[in-house]
């Protein structure tokens, strides 16, 4: 068993990306069990077979990266993975659902949202982050 506590945290972004691939290759080649501690969600998602999300010393959820991303156990888990972060808002903002204020929260990831034509919605874009392959709009 290999234990690693944030081994890539002090490296620059390019080297960190290169070493993620190399560490995963070595781990697969050796067939070794590795317990890898990180606060970097990209490291967790790309390197792990299973991820454990902790809060206050307690395990909130254990599962594959895809399971945790698509079916988080709670708001804490949902807010830990995804770039950009999940959008959370009170369910009472959804018209016509009859949900009492403060009882439920809706989480929406950006890949599941569509920008409405101006005739059917309103909003104002405050900032745009151009990232090359994608752009993040901030409302």
Where are these regions (language model features)?
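Residues located in well-ordered beta-strands
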Residues: 64, 76, 90-92, 122-126
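Short, conserved beta-strand edge motifs with alternating hydrophobic and charged residues
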Residues: 54, 80-82, 90, 105-109
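Structural detector for hydrophobic anchor residues on beta-strands
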Residues: 50, 89, 119-121
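Non-catalytic connector elements of ABC transporters
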Residues: 84, 95-139
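C-terminal boundary and immediately downstream tail of ABC-type ATPase nucleotide-binding domains
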Residues: 70-96
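ABC ATPase nucleotide-binding domains
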Residues: 1-76
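Short glycine/serine/threonine-biased micro-segments
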Residues: 50, 61, 80, 105, ...
